[in-house]
């Protein structure tokens, strides 16, 4: 009876404990996933900023470069806190377009701009930004431009090289203003209302320094020093420092530096192989990366690498940059008149892609890329050589057979008619 009473008391206590737990809804099971992060306010949350999105691979915050096709090649976009280096083409015709697309994307998304140049006033650069293409407003014009530049062979179903139809196609088409990445009309200028409503800062080198300053060996040039101080002040004063908590709404700072490393910036790497300022550019990039890593900012730099005399400096600059994209124009080269490249204006080379929070980079399988500037659009496409449908090959083979027949002589090179060549 004592044992039964003991069991009864244990059962009663267990029942009361279950009743108490059911009333308080307390359980030892905790769900791992989005719900747990929502209920826990102290956990880290991803910053939500207009014109950005997280990477599906490493969770890094991405911004668009202004060219959705280039975003696709870079793994979804340009990561915040990184440097995009554009190797200028020989005559500096197409690289300014990528520079302006990057700035125009920032204005459309409401980002803050910092434009630095030693050649052109930043205010004049903003006046030349392309106009954005949106869904309903410019869809008709976009379709007409694509239709006018579409090759007839693109509509024909492939019978021999049918495997090319299975390749993924580059994204092309206008999108809404709320989506990630936009398209722009290169034949029109951005409305003045958008430029006036934007928040931007300009750094024009001739207005910041005088020509009488002397540069000490193994130190930064005055232009690089002034620019770093200017960028640092904007990051800390405007609230783009990610290491310190900010009370106001977060935003992205887009930094654009034009013609960096050229003699206009007071650098001599384009004039001599072993100049006195050979380490000035690499020091500047090293300090710039330190500023970007701890801030909500992204930077694009155009550099005339084809003018740099010392190739070792180019290798160091590539290492200090996160993303390196090279433009090779056909102007002035043999490929300009080559019929194989008649549909393109140049080649684009993805030389380096960053490895951020990952062991490997999100590298595209496509290596052969070309670009062309249409009436309104700057497009990046896979390089496809046209099929050889001409009769030049057959004519050349006939001429070779005729010459060989003459050398062989009438005994074995002539047929019964005496006028026909040897046919294999």
From Swiss-Prot:
Q: Which domain of life is it from?
A: Eukaryota
Q: In which tissues is it expressed?
A: Widely expressed.
- Asked if the record carries the keyword Amino-acid biosynthesis, the reply is no
GO cellular component term of the entry, any = transcription elongation factor complex
Q: What GO molecular function annotations does the UniProt record carry, in alphabetical order? A: phosphorylase kinase regulator activity
| Major place of residence | cytoplasm
**Location(s) in or outside the cell:** Cytoplasm; Nucleus
Pathway linked to the protein: tRNA modification; 5-methoxycarbonylmethyl-2-thiouridine-tRNA biosynthesis
The Gene Ontology biological process terms listed for this entry are:
regulation of transcription by RNA polymerase II; regulation of translation; tRNA wobble uridine modification
- Disease linked to the protein: Aniridia 2: A form of aniridia, a congenital, bilateral, panocular disorder characterized by complete absence of the iris or extreme iris hypoplasia. Aniridia is not just an isolated defect in iris development but it is associated with macular and optic nerve hypoplasia, cataract, corneal changes, nystagmus. Visual acuity is generally low but is unrelated to the degree of iris hypoplasia. Glaucoma is a secondary problem causing additional visual loss over time.
Protein name as it appears in the record: Elongator complex protein 4
């Amino acid at each position: 009876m004592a044992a039964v009473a003991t069991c009864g008391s244990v059962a009663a206590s267990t029942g009361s404990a279950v009743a108490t737990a059911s009333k308080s809804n307390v359980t030892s099971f905790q769900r791992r996933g989005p719900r747990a992060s929502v209920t826990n306010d102290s956990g880290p949350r991803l910053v939500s900023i207009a014109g950005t999105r997280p990477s599906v691979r490493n969770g890094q915050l991405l911004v668009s470069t202004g060219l959705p096709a280039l975003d696709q090649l870079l793994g979804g976009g340009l990561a915040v806190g990184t440097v995009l280096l554009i190797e200028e083409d020989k005559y500096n015709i197409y690289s300014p377009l990528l520079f302006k697309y990057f700035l125009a994307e920032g204005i459309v998304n409401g980002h803050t701009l910092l434009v630095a140049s030693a050649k052109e006033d930043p205010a004049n650069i903003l006046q030349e930004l392309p106009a954005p293409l949106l869904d309903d407003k410019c869809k008709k014009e976009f379709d007409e431009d694509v239709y006018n530049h579409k090759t007839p062979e693109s509509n024909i179903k492939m019978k021999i090289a049918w495997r090319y139809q299975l390749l993924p196609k580059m994204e092309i088409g206008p999108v809404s203003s709320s989506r990630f990445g936009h398209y722009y009309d290169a034949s029109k200028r951005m409305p003045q209302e958008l430029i006036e409503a934007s928040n931007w800062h300009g750094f024009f080198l001739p207005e910041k320094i005088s020509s009488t300053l002397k540069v000490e060996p193994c130190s930064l040039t005055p232009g690089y020093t002034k620019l770093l101080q200017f960028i640092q002040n904007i990051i800390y004063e405007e609230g783009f420092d990610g290491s310190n908590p900010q009370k106001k709404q977060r935003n992205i700072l887009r930094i654009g530096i034009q013609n960096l490393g050229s003699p206009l910036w007071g650098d001599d790497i384009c004039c001599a192989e072993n100049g006195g300022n050979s380490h000035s550019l690499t020091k500047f990039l090293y300090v710039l990366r330190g500023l970007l890593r701890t801030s909500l900012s992204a930077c694009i730099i155009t550099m005339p690498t084809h003018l740099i005399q010392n190739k070792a400096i180019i290798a160091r600059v590539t290492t200090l940059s996160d993303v390196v994209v090279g433009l090779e124009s056909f102007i002035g080269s043999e490929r300009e008149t080559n019929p194989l490249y008649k549909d393109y204006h140049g080649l684009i080379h993805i030389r380096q892609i960053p490895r951020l929070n990952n062991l490997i980079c999100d590298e595209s399988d496509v290596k052969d890329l070309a670009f062309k500037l249409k009436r309104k659009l700057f497009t990046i496409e896979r390089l496809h050589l046209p099929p050889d449908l001409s009769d030049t090959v057959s004519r050349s083979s006939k001429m070779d057979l005729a010459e060989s027949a003459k050398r062989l002589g009438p005994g074995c090179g002539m047929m019964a008619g005496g006028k026909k060549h040897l046919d294999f």
